Design a protein with these regions (language model features):
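A short, hydrophobic beta-strand-centered structural micro-motif
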Residues: 39-48
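Short, charge-patterned binding micro-sites
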Residues: 35-36
Length: 145
């Protein structure tokens, strides 16, 4: 069995990079958030690869990738709206009933792209309030060879 998680994460990155805006500014997209990163931004990381079915001729996996939108405001200011607006753009680009990532050149067939839930979190620090929208994005992937 081959591991396609990194291929899905790359496709997610490519789909979002340069395409999500808030207040006329394009959000940065990261796989690793640099110390120089500034809010708001999008953070993408892999969660799991669950082998859902296998037989003598193929493996089918459920790949879970998390996509987070993180915004920050001075303590007791701001709100979740920017996270919700950015997440709305993200789900429109990623979640589909009929068109999925093309991984055929890597010997995979993607035939599912689902929103497995969006979680909204508010975190207070000494100086800021962070608002996070976290999408659990599931792709169903078949290894073709």
């Amino acid at each position: 069995m081959k591991e396609p998680s990194y291929l899905i994460r790359k496709k997610v990155y490519d789909a979002l990079d340069g395409n999500i805006t808030l207040n006329s500014a394009t959000l940065s997209v990261y796989n690793v958030v640099p110390s120089s990163g500034s809010y708001p931004y999008i953070y993408i990381y892999s969660i799991s690869n669950d082998n859902t079915e296998s037989n003598k001729s193929k493996y089918i996996s459920s790949i879970t990738t998390r996509i987070e939108v993180i915004t920050a405001f001075d303590t007791n200011t701001g709100g979740q709206l920017d996270c919700i607006l950015a997440m709305n753009q993200i789900t429109q680009l990623l979640v589909s009933q009929s068109s999925y990532f093309d991984l055929s050149s890597d010997n995979f067939n993607v035939y599912g792209a689902r929103n497995n839930g969006i979680t909204y979190i508010t975190e207070d620090t000494d100086t800021q309030t962070l608002y996070r929208a976290i999408l659990s994005f599931e792709s169903t992937v078949e290894q073709t060879s």
